[in-house]
Every structure is written in C-alpha cells, then in structure tokens.
C-alpha cells in the first residue's frame, strides 16, 4: 500500500484494477489451496528443478490481475518491491492466457466506455494506472512483448482511434515502426492510428508524476499521424535535394502504401508521397503500375521458359539398350567385342564394365 501511495495510485484505482500482493513465502498458495495440479496449470506454481515439489511463481510482488473481455482473470503481472530481478514477471503461456493476444486494462477501459473514442497503448502496468488516475481512462498495455498483430486487431474492434505511446529512444522508435508495419494491411478508411514518442527515458507515468495531467495531454496533442510518422521515418534515410533521394523515397514508400486497403487513406498517402518527390499522383500511380506489370512479365518469362529437350548421346543410348536387353551380349561376335574395347568416347568405360559383367554372368536380367 505504501508503495502504491508513493507512486500516486489511489485506493479507488487499486480497487478498480483489483491490485493485490503476493507474500514473500515460497509456499503460500499450496498452503491455501492444496490443489497443485490446477495451480501448476494456471502458471501460479513452478515445478522445482529436481521435480521434488513446487514453489510459488509470484513472491513479494504487487500483483496486477489480467482480465479477458468478460472480466475473468486469466493471468497476472507481478512487480517486485525490492531490487530483485526481473522487475516485472508475467504469468507463462497457458490454455487460458496468451500474452500476445491480451491487453492489460482493456476490460477496465471498456467498463468506463463500451466503445471508447480512442485508446492509448502504453508499455507498462503502472502507465495504465497513472493514466486512469489522471482521469484519462482509456489506456491499455502490452504484456512485456512487442505489440502483436492480434493485439492490433483487438484494439481495432474496440475503437476507431489508437495512439501508440513509446519512449523516444532508439528501441522505442524501432518498436513504433514495427507496429506501423504490422498495421498497414489492417488499416481501413475510418480508422486513425497515431504515434506518440515521449522524450528519451520518459513514460506516461513519469510524465504525469513530473508534469501532471496537462503535461501529458500536451504531448498527446503532438502525436504524429500514421502518414507523418511513416514519412518522417523514411526521410531520415534519403536526401530529397537529390534526384536519387526522391527515387529512393518512392521505392521505400510505395510497397508500404500499397499494403493499405484501396480507399481514401491510401490515396492520401500517395498524394503526400507525390508532393515529396515532385510528381503528380496520376504519374506516380502509373509508374507504380508499370513497375508491377514489368515484374509480372519478368516472372511470367521465368515461368514460361521452354523446356530443353533431353538429347541422348549414342553412348548413353548404347548403355540404356544393353541394360534393358542384356541378351544382346550373346549375339555379338568376337570382332565386335574387340571394337568395343578400343572405344575412347565419354561413357565408354561404363559401357565396357556393363558389357563384361553381362558376358561373365549371362543369367543376369534387367530385373
């Protein structure tokens, strides 16, 4: 309780999220519930390395229950109160809990508003609590992993606007770009995706602690649209003052834009690209179409290469004939046999070996 108070979390928020505490003992759950099979299956127990018993997975940690859409607890996140590592520990994958599909705080967000206008995606449990505490009750967190495609789909089924919030360091920028790449082919007209990169080393919790609710909202208003983030990221790699830079930007951007479903959003992205490379949209789209057609034609040519007919040399035919009809050896005269021994053609050595094998073993057949 003291730790939560130090972090600015009220009793009301702790109650809303059903925060708990796992005692430091190694056998609290076994003493309380006895049934080790269910506890093991749910990930709350860990089997000892010598297989001689079990111990509690979560010890001396604040517990964050993770709920599914119906509010059922399917897993836990645990935060240490000491310097113990790891700082955060999640339930393992179980039949109920798949951390790549779940989002902490989504149930609580939808309890406030069944169809929220927007959802902020953050990286930590405490970030979610801090945002709810600051009366911004539309925050969810990934569960210690990179944002997955399944999580993006789940978010899109819950709201029309998603704001992905990351630390502004290199790792945060890379994580944000991965989210953008995974989102493109899911994006349809009507959805809004924005990207908020906080100052290096900051997260929503720390911003609210230092600058309050208004400080975070100021950052929120600066969140980049998908188009702004996409082109800002790509422009770092090119020099638009050079013709080659414009061509490279188009080469990098077009495959990404084409992943977006055909519609207004895709057209607007092409418009922005056209403006950056000083082309009109129609010409840019035509170049894209021509490149596609050329790629298809090249592939078709590769697929339609004429078969090369297999031509057999006389020596190869002789070996095949002898192997198929070994009785031929009996009909050859001594003079013909001597002629065979003087052959110096590719494959003649194999022909002679086969000939003498059949000569010495007349009972051999092609079978």
Indicate where each model-derived feature is located:
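Non-catalytic interaction/clamp surfaces of large macromolecular machines
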Residues: 1-15
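Non-catalytic protein-protein interaction segments used by genome-maintenance enzymes to assemble
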Residues: 229, 290-363
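Conserved catalytic cores of soluble enzyme domains
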Residues: 114, 145-200, 207-213
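C-terminal or mid-to-C-terminal helical accessory/interaction module adjacent to the motor/catalytic core
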Residues: 190-280
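Terminal amphipathic helices with adjacent charged low-complexity linkers/tails
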Residues: 14-21, 266, 271-299
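Phosphate-handling DNA/RNA-contact segment within nucleic-acid enzymes
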Residues: 23-158, 162, 175-176
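Conserved phosphate/pyrophosphate-binding and hydrolysis machinery centered on Walker-type P-loop NTPases
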Residues: 19-23, 57-59, 122, 239-250, ...
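Structured, non-catalytic alpha/beta "coupling" segments that mediate domain-domain communication
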Residues: 57-79, 205-212, 216-218, 279-283, ...
């Amino acid at each position: 309780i003291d730790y939560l108070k130090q972090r600015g979390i009220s009793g009301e928020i702790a109650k809303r999220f059903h925060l708990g505490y796992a005692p430091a003992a190694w056998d609290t759950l076994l003493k309380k519930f006895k049934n080790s099979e269910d506890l093991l299956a749910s990930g709350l127990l860990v089997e000892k390395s010598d297989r001689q018993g079990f111990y509690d997975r979560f010890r001396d940690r604040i517990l964050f229950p993770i709920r599914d859409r119906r509010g059922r607890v399917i897993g836990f996140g645990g935060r240490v109160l000491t310097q113990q590592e790891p700082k955060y520990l999640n339930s393992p994958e179980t039949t109920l809990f798949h951390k790549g599909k779940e989002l902490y705080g989504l149930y609580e967000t939808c309890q406030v508003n069944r169809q929220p206008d927007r959802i902020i995606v953050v990286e930590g449990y405490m970030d979610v609590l801090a945002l709810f505490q600051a009366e911004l009750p539309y925050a969810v967190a990934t569960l210690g992993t990179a944002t997955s495609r399944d999580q993006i789909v789940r978010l899109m089924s819950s709201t029309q606007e998603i704001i992905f919030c990351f630390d502004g360091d290199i790792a945060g920028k890379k994580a944000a770009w991965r989210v953008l790449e995974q989102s493109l082919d899911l994006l349809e007209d009507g959805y809004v995706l924005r990207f908020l990169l906080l100052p290096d080393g900051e997260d929503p919790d720390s911003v609210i602690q230092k600058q309050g609710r208004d400080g975070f909202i100021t950052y929120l208003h600066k969140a980049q649209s998908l188009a702004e983030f996409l082109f800002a990221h790509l422009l770092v790699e090119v020099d638009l003052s050079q013709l080659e830079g414009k061509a490279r930007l188009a080469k990098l951007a077009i495959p990404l834009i084409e992943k977006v479903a055909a519609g207004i959003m895709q057209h607007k992205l092409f418009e922005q690209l056209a403006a950056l490379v000083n082309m009109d949209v129609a010409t840019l789209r035509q170049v894209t179409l021509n490149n596609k057609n050329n790629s298809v034609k090249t592939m078709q040519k590769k697929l339609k290469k004429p078969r090369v007919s297999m031509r057999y040399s006389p020596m190869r035919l002789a070996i095949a004939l002898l192997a198929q009809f070994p009785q031929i050896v009996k009909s050859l005269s001594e003079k013909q046999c001597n002629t065979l021994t003087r052959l110096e053609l590719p494959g003649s050595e194999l022909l002679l070996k086969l000939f003498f094998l059949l000569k010495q073993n007349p009972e051999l057949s092609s079978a």
